[in-house]
Structure formats: C-alpha cells, structure tokens
C-alpha cells in the first residue's frame, strides 16, 4: 500500500504512546533546542539580515468544500481549510516574531497539516511556496501559489498559481492513491534567477521566475515512477533530488539523484537537433542507501547532508526519536550526524556553520534545533 507524503507526517498519539518512546528518542548531544512554539514548522532559510526565517503549516481551519470540487479520498481526505499558515522570523537569541500570515492552511482527515511549505530568498526578496491551498484542501479561493513576501509590511502577493499549473501539466505517471488535485508542494530553492519547487506526490519539479513565469523542469515520474521526491539542492550547477519513498518504510531504499543541464547527444538521433531539450535536466548519477529523505543541503565542508524523517521499518507510530541527519562523507559512505529527531521536516545551514532543523514538524508546537556538524 502506498502512503503519500502528507500521511507520513501525521503525528497523532495518545499520552500512553508518548510515554512509551524508547531511549533512542533522546536527541544526540550535538543537538540543542534553538526555538520552540512554532506551528508545524517546515522549510527554513537565513535571510540577508542574518535572521532565520521559518515556514509554518499552521493549524488548518474549518472550511469544507465537499460537493464543490474534486476531493482527496479517505483516509487522507477530506480536508478542512483556513488561513492560519504563516512565516516567522527568529533572531539570534531564538525569539520569534511573525513576518507574514494569512496563508492557506489545511487539516487532513487523518490529522496532518499543510500550509506554507518552504521559503527562499531570490535577489534579497523573500518567496514562499504553499501546500495547503486549493479547493481540494478546503481553500477554494486560495490556490497553492508561489508568493512574494514583503518582510517589512508583512504583506504578500501570489506571483504563480501552482494549483492551476499542476492541473494543466499532469505528470506522465501519476499514482492514483497519492493523487492531489491541487498538489502538495514541499521544497523551494532559488537558483540562477529562478525559484524551484517539488511536488512529491505527482513527482514533478517546477520553476518560476520572479514575475511568475512557470515551467515544468522535470517529470521524475517519467524516469523513476512513483518515488515521492521531496528535497532539492544545487551545488556547482548540478541539481540533487532526494526521495521519501513509499510506505511501509524499507530502510536504505531511498536515494539521492544528481541532474545536469542536458546537452545534445552526439551524433543527433535520426538527424534531429535538440531544440528546447538543451535546457532539460538529465540524470547523471544516483546514490542509494538513504531512508525517507525530506531535505538536502550542502554544508560549509562541501559535503552533502540529508534529513531523514524516519529510519524505522514498517509503519512506526508515533515516529518520535527515529529521525536523523546523515551525510555523505569524502569516502562516499553515509554516516550519522545527529539522531533522535522527531518528525523533522526541513533544514538549512546558518552563516555560523551550524545546521538548523525543523523538529516536531507535524505537531502544533514545533521546534527548531541547532546542530553542530563538527
């Protein structure tokens, strides 16, 4: 049975189940709590001002659109929508202030929350991608978007309608069990004057200019099938994409793929040139051995770091203390960096060389961890 990304982030547990968390749930000694009290924290980035900006899914809402549009089937759907998604800023002491609010947020029938999924700075301007928008999420008048955010006034404006674009550009091989009419976007990065975002359940990579010019960069489903790609990083012009995989969890079954901007094959097949294909991303390599990857980043040491949601086999619930940060060392081996994380959902390196991770990302009261990687 295939379970989608959002279901895997559900963190509904009784007091008894929380009390039974094994000793492994303790954070490794190199991880400390930097901030707490965030509402389902997801992706995070440092801004030009040196402060840490955090995307928050919010708390969902009470609006139902059942009967008005296509719905996500049970047990995930239907959703209840609202406008409780927000972006927060943490100062150097970990104190939180709200940067912008009123983003679409949604609560699934099984308890999961989606809202602001990730953020990125492009030429000094803050942008956000949402995952809780669209009629199928109970937000008929608020589609999933890439939004430009004014960090001074707190206002924001949609520059690209992702709900509309994902519907007009369907994946080659969508999985019916994980299909989302409005998409559930997860990662956002800025590169070469464009913003790149992944839709995991459809398996597509999209990009947008600052003016909202959208295009599909890569249909991962066409190359890889349904693998639930969640995370993206860029290093030396090469794109790296990691995948969550399917449930039940099979440890070490996820991978990180590298993609280059494609060049024309030589000689040209059948005498045809490449045309627009010269801009396409082409798979150049992959590394298996990871488990449930939800974020990627390159450290100041030049090594590739991966955030793993859960490394326990099967359907572990609740998933406390089984998340970790790993890295690919110079010998090509995967090694643990930090363990004992609970539903980690995003990470970024700070200018201080520490790694900052969203922890308890599916809980109403989430944390940001500060991790030494040395």
Question: Where do the protein language model's features map onto the residues?
Answer:
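Beta-rich, blade/repeat-based domains predominating
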Residues: 37-49, 84, 105-125, 166-195, ...
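Generic structural signal for coil-to-beta-strand starts
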Residues: 51, 95, 124-127, 145, ...
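Residue position within the beta-strands of beta-propeller blades
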Residues: 53-57, 61, 127-130, 197, ...
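Short loop/turn segments immediately following the C-termini of beta-strands
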Residues: 57-59, 131-133, 141, 200-201, ...
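Blade-loop segments of beta-propeller domains
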Residues: 69-90, 96-120
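A short loop-to-beta-strand structural motif that recurs across blades of beta-propeller domains
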Residues: 75-79, 83-88, 144-147, 204-207, ...
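Short loop/turn segments that connect beta-strands within beta-propeller blades
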Residues: 90-95, 150-154, 208-213, 260-264, ...
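Surface-exposed loop and turn segments in beta-propeller and other repeat-based domains
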Residues: 95-111, 154-181, 215-227, 269-289
């Amino acid at each position: 049975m295939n379970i989608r990304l959002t279901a895997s982030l559900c963190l509904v547990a009784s007091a008894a189940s929380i009390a039974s968390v094994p000793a492994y749930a303790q954070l490794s000694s190199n991880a400390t709590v930097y901030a707490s009290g965030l509402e389902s924290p997801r992706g995070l980035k440092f801004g030009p001002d040196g402060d840490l900006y955090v995307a928050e899914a919010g708390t969902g809402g009470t609006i139902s659109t059942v009967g008005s549009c296509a719905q996500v089937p049970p047990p995930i759907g239907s959703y209840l929508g609202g406008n409780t998604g927000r972006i927060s800023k943490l100062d150097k002491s970990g104190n939180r202030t709200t940067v912008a609010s009123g983003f679409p947020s949604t609560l699934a029938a099984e308890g999961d929350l989606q809202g602001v999924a990730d953020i990125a700075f492009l030429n000094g301007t803050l942008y956000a991608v949402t995952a809780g928008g669209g009629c199928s999420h109970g937000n008929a008048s608020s589609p999933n978007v890439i939004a430009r955010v004014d960090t001074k006034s707190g206002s924001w404006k949609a520059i690209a309608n992702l709900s509309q674009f994902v519907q007009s550009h369907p994946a080659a091989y969508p999985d019916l069990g994980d299909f989302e009419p409005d998409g559930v976007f997860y990662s956002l990065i800025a590169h070469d004057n464009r913003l790149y975002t992944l839709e995991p359940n459809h398996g597509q990579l999209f990009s947008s200019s600052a003016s909202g010019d959208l295009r599909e960069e890569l249909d991962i489903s066409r190359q890889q099938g349904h693998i639930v790609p969640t995370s993206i990083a860029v290093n030396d012009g090469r794109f790296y994409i990691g995948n969550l995989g399917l449930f039940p969890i099979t440890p070490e079954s996820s991978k990180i793929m590298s993609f280059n901007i494609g060049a024309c094959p030589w000689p040209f097949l059948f005498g045809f040139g490449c045309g627009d294909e010269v801009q396409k991303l082409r798979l150049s390599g992959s590394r298996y051995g990871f488990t449930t990857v939800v974020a990627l980043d390159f450290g100041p040491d030049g090594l590739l770091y991966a955030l793993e949601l859960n490394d326990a086999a099967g359907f572990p619930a609740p998933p406390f203390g089984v998340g970790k940060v790993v890295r690919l060392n110079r010998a090509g081996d995967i090694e643990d960096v930090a363990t004992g994380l609970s539903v980690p959902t995003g990470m970024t390196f700070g200018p201080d060389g520490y790694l900052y991770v969203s922890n308890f990302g599916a809980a109403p009261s989430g944390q940001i961890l500060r991790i030494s990687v040395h």
